[in-house]
Amino acid sequence: MSHYEGDLRPAGARFVIVCSRWNARITDALVAGACHSLVDNGVPDDAVDVVRVPGAWEIPIVANLLAQAGQHAAIIALGCVVRGDTRHYEHVADLCAEGMMSVQMQTGVPVLNGVLAVECIKDAEMRAGGSHGNKGAETALAALEMVSLLEKLP
């Protein structure tokens, strides 16, 4: 029986972080965490690109263009959507996730979902370097592992 599992060795891969500017204090911390994770695991600074988009809604179209361009082994999507008084939050968070899933299924390029969908800004703070860690860093580690795994699969 064969067993396949990715590791955290980048093997010369390029990565791109697509991050929303909305809730910048949170998203800046997510980007910093992702960059540190990549560099700490051997990815050179010049093998990481960062693309800023206005909000989470715009992440899938940019991820799609980048995936089709074929210059990156994985796309790390980061953002922060906070529940408000209307259902807008649900539409943005759900359709952003669906869009990212569609991109990776259609292109074969992993799109890792680090878009926070939280009840309040305090929840986001806890996930952007607070008591719940840094989800940007965790998403970058998942990207490293997926790139490695996809290279190993028959």
Curated annotation (Swiss-Prot):
Residue positions of the active site: 88 (proton donor)
Catalyses which reaction(s): (2S)-2-hydroxy-3-oxobutyl phosphate + 5-amino-6-(D-ribitylamino)uracil = 6,7-dimethyl-8-(1-D-ribityl)lumazine + phosphate + 2 H2O + H(+)
GO biological process per UniProt: riboflavin biosynthetic process
Entry GO CC: cytosol; riboflavin synthase complex
Pathway membership, UniProt: Cofactor biosynthesis; riboflavin biosynthesis; riboflavin from 2-hydroxy-3-oxobutyl phosphate and 5-amino-6-(D-ribitylamino)uracil: step 1/2
Any Pfam family: DMRL_synthase
Superkingdom of origin organism: Bacteria
GO molecular function: 6,7-dimethyl-8-ribityllumazine synthase activity
InterPro entries (UniProt xref): LS, LS/RS, LS/RS_sf
Bilayer-spanning residue ranges: none
Residues reported to bind (2S)-2-hydroxy-3-oxobutyl phosphate: 85-86, 127
Keywords from the UniProt entry: Riboflavin biosynthesis, Transferase
Positions annotated to bind 5-amino-6-(D-ribitylamino)uracil: 22, 56-58, 80-82, 113
EC number, UniProt record: 2.5.1.78
EC top class, as a word: transferase
Function: Catalyzes the formation of 6,7-dimethyl-8-ribityllumazine by condensation of 5-amino-6-(D-ribitylamino)uracil with 3,4-dihydroxy-2-butanone 4-phosphate. This is the penultimate step in the biosynthesis of riboflavin.
Family, per entry: Belongs to the DMRL synthase family.
Record's subunit section: Forms an icosahedral capsid composed of 60 subunits, arranged as a dodecamer of pentamers.
UniProt name for this protein: 6,7-dimethyl-8-ribityllumazine synthase
Organism: Xylella fastidiosa (strain Temecula1 / ATCC 700964)
Lineage: Bacteria, Pseudomonadati, Pseudomonadota, Gammaproteobacteria, Lysobacterales
